[in-house]
């Protein structure tokens, strides 16, 4: 344990905190620098000449994900292979081991609920014992299990997957979407995270990017990205609030936009509040009503529950534009008396009553964010809505009541975050030069000191990147080592906050308590990820770590997952090749049989039989297609095609010569007739 009592004395004798220029400006004002000068000084940290190629912006969402790229000065949202601009963040594993991502995974969820993963972003960077995780285990049909490191992972067909891996599979789909559009490999990316994500969750998201094969240049906050999308082409200076209620998380950020500088003043939120909770509340209501009417409890039937879950989500969306909707699920389940059907009418007012407590949970974070930013609602010039749940009229009314103005609909709530990520990618690549983003750390950072007290070194809403040092001392006589426990949160006692990690500084010369001087330095990079060092000022001995939670993924874990992801990518490529080869072969068989019927009178019988044998062999090959390579199938199909082309060429020539013969004979007959007429 180390003592904080020394810190006050140390400060009296001149120990000071070192800060980044951004942090200093945030706390001390502009220090006489113009916006342009400050932008010029700071941009060295934000752009890099080493970045080659396009930087894709990815909104890795709880429910849906979206990808965008910069085209000139404009960001473009890309359509996936299914033609949609957003992709469901759903991953499924079929009984034969095939992995499905996006809409194909979502479509089969009813028949495969135990092995279809959705909303796993809510588990990312979390421990299995977290109350939120324990709550989730009761609400989802798939298995959430404790990993060997204590983190919450998921299980399918006996295999364990980290939430970072599931996120990586979704990111690979987004990467593929970008590559199909760009026509070349997409390597660099900016990925967004909820503003209120802690360090563990940010690190786990970055791990997901690495597993997917992406070079994650920056992790930025979702509300900040949305503000970039909103303010890129705006010239006026103003303070804006970004209210982001998505599929799994809620964030509120207050920003000041001034001459291309986007400065986050404060942020707050709830990382376990979103559309999934609205769906779950409605699902519970439907299940309760169904049991009251039929006496059947649906909670034991995962397949029926998945149907109800999808119907609840659909009804929720419909009630944003309609005042009433019907929920009809025929043959939902069965008991001794026969099949049971679900038929229910749901009004908007009923739904609002069911979820009113969830909407109210967004109010306190908004009030706290305004308080931290030292602004009143009259100071806020615009309120931007982000996230699918902000389409709900009751949510919009709550926002209007809270901020005293109708919210703006200037951005697409589903696409704004990806657009902002692409813009930040353009800034990092040097393609966008008139924008500077100054974000903040959402939670206070510090260490545990004597008595279990949480001593803050960096307060929440400090502009990042930032660096701060403070001197501590030993708590006992003769102490030769100190354990540094790094925590994140706002509670007074360290045990009530999130333990990010811990390390030990050893080799301190024995001395009376309070004599050794141990300098602890916190450094938060532009991704919001924490680096901590502890140095014995007497010996110069230093210990440094990039904070990883006591769980988290080790370097070896990530490398193994990268290899597995590459293996999956290779399997996907082989599968695609095989499917294309099978389609080609079936097309050639069909064309060959059609032509054989068409030219049957011109084809020699023995040649015709040979061709039929070739077709039979091809069909036998297709019958075992799952064990054949695409190349083998393609070669066999090409061989059949060549054989059929030669035969049909012979038949065509024979038919042509027969036509010529019949044509010349008819011409001769005509000439004879003409001679007879003349005579």
Swiss-Prot record:
It catalyses: ATP + H2O = ADP + phosphate + H(+). Residues 1-432 are annotated as: Interaction with NFS1. The modification N6-malonyllysine is found at residue 206. It comes from the Eukaryota. The chaperone activity is regulated by ATP-induced allosteric coupling of the nucleotide-binding (NBD) and substrate-binding (SBD) domains. ATP binding in the nucleotide-binding pocket (NBP) leads to a conformational change in the NBD, which is transferred through the interdomain linker (IDL) to the substrate-binding domain (SBD). This elicits a reduced substrate affinity and a faster substrate exchange rate. Upon hydrolysis of ATP to ADP, the protein undergoes a conformational change that increases its affinity for substrate proteins. ADP binds at residues 63-64, 313, 316, 320, 388, 391. The modification Phosphothreonine is found at residue 87. The modification Phosphoserine is found at residue 408. PROSITE patterns: HSP70_1, HSP70_2, HSP70_3. Keywords: Acetylation, ATP-binding, Chaperone, Cytoplasm, Hydrolase, Methylation, Mitochondrion, Nucleotide-binding, Nucleus, Phosphoprotein, Transit peptide. It is found in: Mitochondrion; Nucleus, Nucleolus; Cytoplasm; Mitochondrion matrix. Residues 63-431 are annotated as: Nucleotide-binding domain (NBD). Residues 432-679 are annotated as: Interaction with FXN and ISCU. Residues 669-679 have a biased composition (Basic and acidic residues). GO terms for biological process: calcium import into the mitochondrion; cellular response to interleukin-1; chaperone cofactor-dependent protein refolding; erythrocyte differentiation; iron-sulfur cluster assembly; negative regulation of erythrocyte differentiation; negative regulation of hematopoietic stem cell differentiation; negative regulation of hemopoiesis. Residues 442-679 are annotated as: Substrate-binding domain (SBD). It is an enzyme of class 3 (hydrolase). GO terms for molecular function: ATP binding; ATP hydrolysis activity; ATP-dependent protein folding chaperone; enzyme binding; fibroblast growth factor binding; heat shock protein binding; protein folding chaperone; protein-folding chaperone binding. The modification N6-acetyllysine is found at residues 76, 135, 138, 143, 206, 234, 288, 300, 360, 567, 600, 612, 646. The modification Omega-N-methylarginine is found at residue 513. One of its GO terms (cellular component) is mitochondrion. Residues 1-46 form a transit peptide. Interacts strongly with the intermediate form of FXN and weakly with its mature form. Interacts with HSCB. Associates with the mitochondrial contact site and cristae organizing system (MICOS) complex, composed of at least MICOS10/MIC10, CHCHD3/MIC19, CHCHD6/MIC25, APOOL/MIC27, IMMT/MIC60, APOO/MIC23/MIC26 and QIL1/MIC13. This complex was also known under the names MINOS or MitOS complex. The MICOS complex associates with mitochondrial outer membrane proteins SAMM50, MTX1, MTX2 and DNAJC11, mitochondrial inner membrane protein TMEM11 and with HSPA9. This is Stress-70 protein, mitochondrial. It comes from Rattus norvegicus (Rat). The gene is Hspa9.
């Amino acid at each position: 344990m180390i003592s904080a009592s020394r810190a006050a004395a140390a400060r009296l004798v001149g120990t000071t905190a070192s800060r980044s220029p951004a942090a200093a400006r945030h706390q001390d004002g502009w220090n006489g620098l113009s916006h342009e000068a400050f932008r010029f000084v700071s941009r060295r940290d934000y752009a890099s000449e080493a970045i080659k190629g396009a930087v894709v912006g990815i909104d890795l969402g709880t429910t849906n994900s979206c990808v965008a790229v910069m085209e000139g000065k404009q960001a473009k949202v890309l359509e996936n292979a299914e033609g949609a601009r957003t992709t469901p963040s759903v991953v499924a594993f079929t009984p034969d081991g095939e992995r499905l991502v996006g809409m194909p995974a979502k479509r089969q969820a009813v028949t495969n609920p135990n092995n279809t993963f959705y909303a796993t972003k809510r588990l990312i960077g979390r421990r299995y014992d977290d109350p939120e995780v324990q709550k989730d285990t009761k609400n989802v049909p798939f298995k959430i299990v404790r990993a060997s490191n204590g983190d919450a992972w998921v299980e399918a067909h006996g295999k364990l997957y980290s939430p970072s891996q599931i996120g990586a599979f979704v990111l690979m789909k987004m990467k593929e979407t970008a590559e199909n559009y760009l026509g070349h490999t997409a390597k660099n990316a900016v990925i967004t995270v909820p503003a209120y994500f802690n360090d563990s969750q940010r690190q786990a998201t970055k791990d997901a990017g690495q597993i997917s094969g992406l070079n994650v240049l920056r992790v930025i906050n979702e509300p900040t990205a949305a503000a970039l999308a909103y303010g890129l082409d705006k010239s006026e200076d103003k303070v804006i609030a970004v209210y982001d209620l998505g599929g799994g998380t809620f964030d509120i950020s207050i920003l000041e936009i001034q001459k291309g500088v986007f400065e986050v003043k404060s942020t707050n939120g709830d990382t376990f509040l979103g559309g999934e909770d609205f769906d779950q509340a409605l699902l519970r209501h439907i299940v309760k009503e169904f049991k009251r009417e039929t006496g059947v409890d649906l909670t034991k039937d995962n397949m029926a529950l998945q149907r109800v879950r999808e119907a609840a989500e659909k009804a929720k969306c419909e009630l944003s534009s309609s005042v009433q909707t019907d929920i009809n699920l025929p043959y939902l389940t069965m008991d001794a008396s026969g099949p049971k059907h679900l038929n229910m009418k749901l009004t908007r007012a009923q739904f609002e009553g069911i979820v009113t407590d969830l909407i109210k949970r967004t109010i306190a974070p908004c009030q706290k964010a305004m308080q931290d930013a030292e602004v009143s609602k009259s100071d806020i010039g615009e309120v931007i809505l982000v996230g699918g749940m902000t389409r709900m009229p009751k949510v919009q009314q709550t926002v209007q009541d809270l901020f005293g103005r109708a919210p703006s609909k200037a951005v697409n709530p589903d696409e704004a975050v990806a657009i902002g990520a692409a813009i930040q990618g353009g800034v990092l690549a040097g393609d966008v030069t008139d924008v500077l983003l100054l974000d903040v750390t959402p939670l206070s950072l510090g260490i545990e000191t004597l008595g279990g007290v949480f001593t803050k070194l960096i307060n929440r809403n400090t502009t990042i990147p930032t660096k701060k040092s403070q001197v501590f001392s030993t708590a006992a006589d003769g102490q030769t080592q100190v354990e540094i426990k790094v925590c994140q949160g706002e509670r007074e006692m360290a045990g009530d906050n999130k333990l990010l990690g811990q390390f030990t500084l050893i080799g301190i010369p024995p001395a009376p308590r309070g004599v050794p001087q141990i300098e602890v330095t916190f450094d938060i990079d532009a991704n919001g990820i924490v680096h901590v060092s502890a140095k014995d000022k007497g010996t110069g001995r230093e210990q440094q770590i990039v904070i990883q939670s006591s769980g988290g993924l080790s370097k070896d874990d990530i490398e193994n997952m990268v290899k597995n992801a590459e293996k999956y990518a290779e399997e996907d490529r082989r599968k695609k090749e095989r499917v294309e080869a099978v389609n080609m072969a079936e097309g050639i068989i069909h064309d060959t049989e059609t032509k054989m019927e068409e030219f049957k009178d011109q084809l020699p019988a023995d040649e015709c039989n040979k061709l039929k044998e070739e077709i039979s062999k091809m069909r036998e090959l297709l019958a075992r297609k799952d064990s054949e390579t695409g190349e083998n199938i393609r070669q066999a199909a090409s061989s059949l095609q060549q054989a059929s082309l030669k035969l049909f060429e012979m038949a065509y020539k024979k038919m042509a010569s027969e036509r010529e013969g019949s044509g010349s004979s008819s011409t001769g007959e005509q000439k004879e007739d003409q001679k007879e007429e003349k005579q």
